């Protein structure tokens, strides 16, 4: 219905015509959106889904039929719990329901083919895997998953708590099946080419994919991601500077000294402002300027807003890859122009350069 209203009822029979006043159309669309805007509305939709659509009730069918982003569900509950509330499936009780329900919203934006393929392979057989024997890249992908669900890195894959958490996931069959369905859905939705970025070690982060701060840091072997509060992180063991860029900064979230003006100049150049305490003559400033000679790399992760406007949680970052110093002006703070190794795709460019100020 929403699509018909927006498109002008193009599907009505030949010779028929429907026109809504702008105010009436807005009123109807607002009411349709409101029906998905709470748990009760979703329960009602689920209860009548098969009758309304003629389709089997599955997560994919529900999302496709109503043109929903998975986060529209996961901001409230799991799809399985909503189905149980609608008496569409039997009620269930599983050990990880609360933990997984919170994690679903973060997993609903995963868009790396490599990571999703790994998870689809490993999650159905968690109780038959020697995690400590996995190849390095797969260990890192497992860490990314673990920190997403449990909020901290797994320091030791043989640790009793870590194994207990993973085995509890294996025992949560209803929600594990939902997780696998979500991952398959996300894989089908990927509409860009992702590829590895050469960092000198087997890193599972892929170009132009979406990652939370915690996911990307554990993928870079930094196991205390929650300690990172600033927009930069130097990883000396890897010789990597990680930049976390938020393009649209709200006054309530940032102080006057952290309202940095960051944006893409074009598909290859990115304007970035250092921290206000960074002088060009400082070790950090010199490392930025001479990173090639120093043998270090700069990685750029960009998001549009701090908060995910759909869930209210923290928005994830798009990985723009490695960047190289071009020039700078100023000191305390430094205005640096970086050249990206790979150009920004058009769909991301609309977001990264729309905030340029004159």
Where are these regions (language model features)?
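Low-complexity, flexible helical/coil segments
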Residues: 2-17, 280-283, 334-342, 356-358
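Long, largely alpha-helical accessory region at the distal end of helicase-like NTP-driven motors
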Residues: 2-121
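Terminal accessory regions of large proteins
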Residues: 80, 91, 95-106, 110, ...
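Short, charged/polar low-complexity linear motifs in solvent-exposed/disordered segments
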Residues: 24, 36, 262-263, 353-355
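Acidic, glycine-rich low-complexity segments with interspersed aromatic residues
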Residues: 76, 82-105, 109, 113, ...
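Charge-dense, extended regions
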Residues: 133-242, 246-250
């Amino acid at each position: 219905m929403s699509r018909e209203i927006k498109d002008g009822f193009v599907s009505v029979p030949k010779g028929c015509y429907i026109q809504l006043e702008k105010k009436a159309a807005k009123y109807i669309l607002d009411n349709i959106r409101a029906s998905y805007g709470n748990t009760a509305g979703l329960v009602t939709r689920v209860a009548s889904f098969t009758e309304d659509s003629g389709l089997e009730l599955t997560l994919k069918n529900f999302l496709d039929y109503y043109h929903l982003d998975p986060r529209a569900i996961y901001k409230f509950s799991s799809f399985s719990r909503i189905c149980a509330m609608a008496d569409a499936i039997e009620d269930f009780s599983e050990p990880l329901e609360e933990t997984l329900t919170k994690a679903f919203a973060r997993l609903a934006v995963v868009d790396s083919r490599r990571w999703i393929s790994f998870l689809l392979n490993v999650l159905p057989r968690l109780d038959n895997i020697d995690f400590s024997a996995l190849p390095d890249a797969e260990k890192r992908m497992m860490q990314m998953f673990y920190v997403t669900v449990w909020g901290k890195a797994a320091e030791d894959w043989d640790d009793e708590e870590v194994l207990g958490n993973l085995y509890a996931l294996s025992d949560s069959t209803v929600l594990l099946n939902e997780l696998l369905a979500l991952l398959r859905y996300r894989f089908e939705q990927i509409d860009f080419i992702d590829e590895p970025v050469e960092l000198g070690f087997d890193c599972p982060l892929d170009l132009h994919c979406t990652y939370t701060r915690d996911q990307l840091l554990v993928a870079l072997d930094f196991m205390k991601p929650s300690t990172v509060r600033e927009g930069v992180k130097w990883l000396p063991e890897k010789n990597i500077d990680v930049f976390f860029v938020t393009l649209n900064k709200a006054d309530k979230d940032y102080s006057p000294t952290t309202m940095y003006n960051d944006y893409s100049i074009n598909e290859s150049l990115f304007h970035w402002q250092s921290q206000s305490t960074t002088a060009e003559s400082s070790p950090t400033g010199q490392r930025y300027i001479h990173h090639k000679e120093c043998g270090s790399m700069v990685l750029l992760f960009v998001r549009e807003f701090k908060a995910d406007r759909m869930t209210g949680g923290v928005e994830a970052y798009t990985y723009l890859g490695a960047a190289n110093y071009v020039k700078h002006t100023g000191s305390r703070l430094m205005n640096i122009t970086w050249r990206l190794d790979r150009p920004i795709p058009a769909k991301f460019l609309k977001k990264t350069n729309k905030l340029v100020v004159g």
